[in-house]
Amino acid sequence: SMYPSTIMTLNISPETKLGKLIGWNAKEFIRGVTKTYTLEVDGREKGKYNQDELKEMFDNNQISVSSNGVMYRLDRKGLIPVLLEKWFNERVEYKALMKKHGDAGEDDKYGYFKRRQHVQKIILNSLYGVLGLPVFRFYDIDNAEATTLTGQDLIKFTETITNHYYNKELGDKKDYCIYTDTDSVFYPALPLVQKRYPDADVSNDEFMTEQILLVAKEVQDFINNGYNYFATKFLNVRGEHKFDIKQECVAKSAFWVTKKRYGQWIINDGGLTCDKLDVKGLDIVRSSFPPAMRDLMTQVLKDILGDVDKDEIDEKIMKFKKEMKTTDIQNISLPTGVKKLKKFKDVTPKDAVFTTMKKGTPVHVKAAWVYNDLLKYWGLNNFEQIKSSEKIKWIYLKPNTMNIKQIGFKGYDDPPKIMEFIKQNVDYDKLFTRALEKKIRMFYEALKWDMPVDKANTLAVSYTHLTLPTNGLG
């Protein structure tokens, strides 16, 4: 947990905050750039320091300095770091138990402690989150920014020194970093493994994983040694720091759609052999996505990661589109929650069948009202209406005698008459376009692919090459 580690390292807490250096830049300070720094305490100027004076103050006092220039005393631990350290140690214990039971093949206990350590991670990060929350008792925007900006500098530093390791090992000046996230970096292991084993069979997962873990351990140790320099030179923390990076997983392939939205085919997770899809930020796995479409897009992602030919993926998508008409409505309708139904109700004429909706009413709310109105209109009084805060499903309809564009339903205990009406009037083309095509396009554009087409219904035109006589047409 990078943010909690940053808070503990800098000793960020309301009672340890000393002031803020205006104009602070760690790299300039390390290089000895001549400049004057202004010290502010509670927004008031308390003094000015040149390069030498500031260095003397740092050398003679136990003071840390964050990337945004906030200084903290280090001679005693602050309240927030003490709490975080307790929770942090508990997470370390849970992770050790997770690994122990994982190595022993005890899947249930492994799963329990994996979830437990993840809960602990959320608790740790939540304390950072409230630092920037105005209603929090210890709210301080300087402390919140000190955490995030220092964390950003740490990841940039990690990227820089890891590239240095690769460049030294491989004898080049390339940037090998694939991707950086808030608290992680992604690097290809293949260049290092192939440098050491030129004839290695890269398709041998067992051999590659073994070598990758060895290489990752070397890189991991190199980075962690570099963190000693970062803590001392960038933050003026000369004693213990909490920065520690660890190899997390080995992915056979990965696919980035955009920043923070990607999928990985993982074959080793935390030192344990596996074969699973890991998805971050892609809404294809969200519960608000129709189950059948979720299954399709998950398979498409797996195919992309497995380097399946585009034509084969296209065929699966077009086959799904054709078979939508025979798919259970429950599996292709859009699941969602519906709230504050009455809020969107407008003045409705007495003889109107359907309730008038206010401008800007969300489509799923309109769909829920249509369902309730049909219950009344058709006298289906034995069935419960959709209520606020319920989970529903809804779907687009093609032009029909009732002039209904969309309709919701509960997904259980629904009147057969309404369900039959839905079945007869589903607008499959609109549903595919609105719910699925955008997701497909997002993947295909990232790969620079053309969108899939139905080849069976695409007009193919043959051309005959004609050569004109050289002496003209006359």
Per-segment meaning from a language model:
Residues 465-474:
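Single conserved hydrophobic/aromatic residue that forms the stacking wall/gate
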Residues 87-101, 120:
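Non-transmembrane amphipathic alpha-helical segments
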Residues 132-143:
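Gly-rich Lys/Arg/Thr-decorated short loops/hinges at beta-loop-alpha junctions or inter-strand turns
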Residues 15, 92, 96, 129-132, ...:
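Non-catalytic alpha-helical coupling and interface elements of nucleotide-dependent molecular machines
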Residues 183-187:
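A generic structural motif
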Residues 122-130:
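Glycine-rich, acidic and aromatic/proline-enriched surface loops and short helix-turn segments
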Residues 1-68, 75-76, 80-83, 102-112, ...:
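DNA-dependent DNA polymerase catalytic subunits
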